């Protein structure tokens, strides 16, 4: 089962290749699904269309998991494709010897990019 994590948490999407990129739109969509968005220009999107198996590693305060499964495009607009990762298994990296105090701290430096991100997140919530 997937844990909860804060909006904007930076996660790492790993696709065939191997190839990995940070994503900040990963949204929990139930116990076994994650929604996220990728720009149409992302190599990762092309890779997922070719080979949908992937892993998403989520690191936030109190959360250290990798979700394994297959991702498919479920919707798109002119800027991004909206994907659903159907989670087959979750590896919990939690250990009794350490604790994650926080995830990656980041912020937008461009107001238009920040507004666009808010629109993408709202669309992900509607999926």
Regions found by a protein language model. Name each.
Residues 41-98:
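Short, structured beta-strand-loop surface elements
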Residues 2-39, 66-67:
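Short beta-strand segments
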Residues 12-16, 39-48, 124-127:
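Short low-complexity stretches enriched in small and charged residues
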Residues 75-127:
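C-terminal edge-of-domain segments
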Residues 31-33, 49, 69, 105:
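Alpha-helix boundary/interfacial micro-motifs
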Residues 6, 52, 73, 124-127:
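Generic secondary-structure transition motif, activating predominantly at the C-termini of alpha-helices
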